[in-house]
């Protein structure tokens, strides 16, 4: 994926809560080995290689300086160190490891700075929180862990995660979301959303755009979607409330139910629904095999279920 301003690469090893709780193993016998409180001016970009550190960036359009607060705890003093350097308007932060062997450690870095900021973040484990950020393009590549986004504005918001949780709210931009195993919650998005998942749970609400979603195993819940696109659930249920049908609405399920409570006028659409084993319903019309309704519309809502039900009602 092409990245212009903001890139997040997170190769995480384990899932923790969204608070600061990242450990390389257990948190016994830890002592404070490093504390940082530094201020930097005229910073336009940052590169962070955080290792196991938890990372927070808090943007603010009313400030021009970057403040870095960091702490590092370990049961082996000298094993880890947070290094930082400013050069030509770029702030580099890196968690350094010395020698071999293992040890228990945890740490965090908390950054405040301008809302307009170029960021490049890498992390092996830990949690990432980004608040109040403006950019042309936002990308997050994750292995395993959690990410929380609030008030992010970008032409493209691209999130990929192998396993873990995504919580994103108050966003502007078209979002591409892909997660292998875990949960994703997106709310208050102005833009289109394309979401793909292998297993887990999707919850989307207040999306002012078109939503396409595909989930192999799990449940999808959607509320107040401006336009429904392609909804596919291989094994699980999809429940949609107070949302609008679109000119390209397609429903697919191998095993499970698709239930849609729509605010669209059903007479504005044709319907072509089929099921091998289950029931079909559009408004007051029902069928157990196939259900076709021709309202003379240029738009047709199509749906196929192998084993399960499709229900579309106002």
Task: Label every model-predicted segment.
Residues 46-48, 121, 140, 231:
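Active-site alpha-helical segments that house and flank conserved acidic catalytic motifs
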Residues 2-12, 19-77, 98-112, 283-298:
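Short acidic/polar N-terminal linker immediately downstream of export determinants
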Residues 33-41, 81-160, 165-174, 183-192, ...:
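Right-handed parallel beta-helix
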Residues 53, 145, 260-262:
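Extended lipid/amphipathic-ligand handling interfaces
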Residues 61, 166-171, 175, 184-314:
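Short, surface-exposed interaction patches in beta-rich subdomains
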Residues 180:
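Phosphate/pyrophosphate-binding betaalpha-module
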Residues 58, 130-131, 263:
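Surface-exposed, acidic/Ser/Thr-rich flexible loop segments
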Residues 50-52, 72-74, 99, 125, ...:
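Beta-strand elements of well-folded, non-transmembrane domains
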């Amino acid at each position: 994926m092409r990245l212009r301003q903001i890139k997040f690469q997170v190769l995480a090893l384990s899932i923790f809560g969204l608070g600061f709780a990242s450990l390389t193993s257990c948190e016994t016998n830890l002592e404070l080995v490093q504390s940082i409180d530094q201020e930097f001016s005229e910073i336009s970009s940052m590169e962070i290689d955080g290792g196991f550190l938890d990372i927070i960036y808090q943007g603010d359009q009313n400030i021009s300086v970057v403040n870095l607060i960091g702490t590092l705890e370990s049961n082996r003093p000298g094993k880890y160190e947070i290094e930082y350097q400013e050069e030509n308007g770029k702030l580099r932060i890196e968690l350094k490891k010395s020698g071999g062997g293992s040890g228990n450690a945890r740490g965090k870095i908390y950054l405040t700075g301008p809302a307009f900021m170029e960021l490049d973040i890498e992390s092996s484990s830990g949690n990432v929180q980004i608040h109040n950020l403006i950019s042309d393009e936002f990308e997050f590549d994750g292995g395993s862990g959690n990410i929380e986004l609030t008030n992010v504005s970008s032409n493209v918001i691209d999130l990929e995660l192998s396993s873990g949780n995504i919580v994103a709210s108050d966003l502007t931009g078209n979002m591409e979301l892909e997660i292998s195993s875990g949960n994703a919650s997106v709310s208050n998005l102005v833009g289109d959303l394309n979401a793909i998942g292998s297993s887990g749970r999707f919850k989307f609400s207040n999306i002012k755009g078109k939503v396409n979603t595909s989930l192999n195993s799990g449940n999808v819940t959607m509320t107040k979607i401006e336009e429904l696109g392609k909804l596919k659930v291989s094994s699980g249920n999809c429940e949609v409330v107070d949302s609008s049908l679109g000119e390209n609405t397609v429903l697919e399920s191998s095993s499970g139910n698709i239930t849609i409570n729509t605010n669209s006028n059903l007479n504005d659409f044709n319907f072509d629904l089929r099921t091998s084993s289950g029931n079909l319903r559009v408004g007051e019309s029902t069928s157990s095999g196939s259900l076709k309704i021709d309202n003379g519309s240029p738009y047709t809502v199509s749906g196929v279920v192998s084993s399960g039900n499709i229900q579309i009602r106002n």
